[in-house]
Amino acid sequence: MAAGGGLSRSERKAAERVRRLREEQQRERLRQVSRILRKAAAERSAEEGRLLAESEDLVTELQGRSRRREGLKRRQEEVCDDPEELRRKVRELAGAVRSARHLVVYTGAGISTAASIPDYRGPNGVWTLLQKGRPVSAADLSEAEPTLTHMSITQLHKHKLVQHVVSQNCDGLHLRSGLPRTAISELHGNMYIEVCTSCIPNREYVRVFDVTERTALHRHLTGRTCHKCGTQLRDTIVHFGERGTLGQPLNWEAATEAASKADTILCLGSSLKVLKKYPRLWCMTKPPSRRPKLYIVNLQWTPKDDWAALKLHGKCDDVMRLLMDELGLEIPVYNRWQDPIFSLATPLRAGEEGSHSRKSLCRSREEPPPGDQSAPLASATPILGGWFGRGCAKRAKRKKAA
C-alpha cells in the first residue's frame, strides 16, 4: 500500500490485469452463449443447456440484440401492396385529396428514382451502398427529366388540389416540371441555382448546368462572381450536418406557413428520417386531434407510419398514375422545349464559359448550346452533382474511423 492509503503502482497494474482478465472471460462466455443459441434446442448438449441456464442475463441480452437486428432488417425491406389492395388505398387517398382544404406534399428521393437518380436508403440507395463499401453511381444527373410524379404534382397544384410542395431533393426537377417557385420549398437546395449573399436581397442565378462541381460540405463557393457586386457566388445546397440559412430556394417561411395551415399532408418517396427532425413541418405544438392527416407513399418503413391515416406500399409513379386516373385528371408529358429553366436562367458572361465542365441543358438534345464548354452529350462516364453523396461519404468515413 502506498503512503497515504492509496494503491501502489504495482497494485494498480495488478488490479488492471484482473479487470482485463474478467472482461475477456465475459466476452468469451458471451461468444459461447451466442454459438449455443444459434443451434436448435434439440441439438444442444446437456452441458450447453446448463451454461445457458447459468447465463440468463447474457441470453436475454443476446436475444434482445437479435430482435433489434431483425427489426432493422424488416424496416429496410421493400414491401409492395398487391394491385387490388393498392387500388383500394388509392381510392381512399383520392377521397382525401378531394376533401382536403389545404393539402401539402412532402417529397423525397423516391420520386426521382424513375429519372435514374438513386434514393438514399433503398436497396440500391446511396446510404445503403456506402454502408456495404460499394461504389455509388448514377446516370448523368443533367440527363434527368421530371418524372410522372413530378408532372402529376404540378397538375394537382394547377387544379388547386395541392397548395404547396416541400422537397428534400436537390435535383431541381420540381422547378423544371413547371411548378411555380412560390409553391416550392427546396429545403436542401437546388443544383441549378447559385446566389450572391452580399446583395440584399440575395441575388439568384439560375443556370442550365449543375453549379456544384467545385463545392462540397462546408465549401460552397462556385468560382463565379455576382454580375452586380463582384462577390463570389455560392451554391444553395444543404449537406448532411449543415443548417440551411438561405431564403431561396429553401423557402422555409412558406414551408412552415403551409404546414401550419395544412389539414392533409401527402408524403411521397421520403424515408422521413430527416424530415421527422423538423418539428415545424409536423405541427407538433397542436393537440393530436388538430394535426394534419398524414398519407405516406413508400416501399419501406418510415418513422411516421404509426401516425399515418394511410400507408401505401408502392412506387410513386404507380400510385400517382392511379391517383390521377381516380381524380379524372390528365398527366402532362414533360416537354423539354417548355422547360421553365430556360426562361429563368441567367446566361454566363464573356469569359465565364470555361468556369464549369458540366454538361449544360439544352432545348434540343441534338446540339449543345452556343459556346458551351461542358462535357459532350455521349460522355461515357456518369457525371454526378458536386452535392451527390458528399455528405454521406463524409459520414461513412467518420463511422469507419470510429
From Swiss-Prot:
NAD-dependent protein-lysine deacetylase and deacylase activities are activated by nucleic acids. Histone deacetylase activity is activated by DNA. Protein-lysine deacylase activity is activated by RNA. H3K18Ac histone deacetylase activity is inhibited by methylation at Arg-390. H3K18Ac histone deacetylase activity is inhibited by deubiquitination by USP7. PROSITE patterns: SIRTUIN (PS50305). It catalyses: N(6)-acetyl-L-lysyl-[protein] + NAD(+) + H2O = 2''-O-acetyl-ADP-D-ribose + nicotinamide + L-lysyl-[protein]; N(6)-glutaryl-L-lysyl-[protein] + NAD(+) + H2O = 2''-O-glutaryl-ADP-D-ribose + nicotinamide + L-lysyl-[protein]; N(6)-succinyl-L-lysyl-[protein] + NAD(+) + H2O = 2''-O-succinyl-ADP-D-ribose + nicotinamide + L-lysyl-[protein]; N(6)-propanoyl-L-lysyl-[protein] + NAD(+) + H2O = 3''-O-propanoyl-ADP-D-ribose + nicotinamide + L-lysyl-[protein]. The keyword Zinc-finger does not apply. It is found in: Nucleus, Nucleolus; Nucleus, Nucleoplasm; Chromosome; Cytoplasm. Disulfide bonds: none annotated. Residues 1-25, 59-78, 355-385 are annotated as: Disordered. Phosphorylated during mitosis. NAD(+) binds at residues 108-127, 168-171, 269-271, 298-300, 316. Residues 83-330 form the Deacetylase sirtuin-type domain. Its main location: nucleus. It comes from the Eukaryota. GO terms for biological process: DNA damage response; DNA repair; DNA repair-dependent chromatin remodeling; homologous chromosome pairing at meiosis; negative regulation of gene expression, epigenetic; negative regulation of phosphatidylinositol 3-kinase/protein kinase B signal transduction; negative regulation of protein ubiquitination; negative regulation of transcription by RNA polymerase II. Binds 1 zinc ion per subunit. The modification Asymmetric dimethylarginine is found at residue 390. PANTHER family: NAD-DEPENDENT PROTEIN DEACETYLASE SIRTUIN-7, NAD-DEPENDENT PROTEIN DEACYLASE SIRTUIN-5, MITOCHONDRIAL-RELATED. Belongs to the sirtuin family. Class IV subfamily. NAD-dependent protein-lysine deacylase that can act both as a deacetylase or deacylase (desuccinylase, depropionylase, deglutarylase and dedecanoylase), depending on the context. Specifically mediates deacetylation of histone H3 at 'Lys-18' (H3K18Ac). In contrast to other histone deacetylases, displays strong preference for a specific histone mark, H3K18Ac, directly linked to control of gene expression. H3K18Ac is mainly present around the transcription start site of genes and has been linked to activation of nuclear hormone receptors; SIRT7 thereby acts as a transcription repressor. This is NAD-dependent protein deacetylase sirtuin-7. The lineage of its organism: Eukaryota, Metazoa, Chordata, Craniata, Vertebrata.
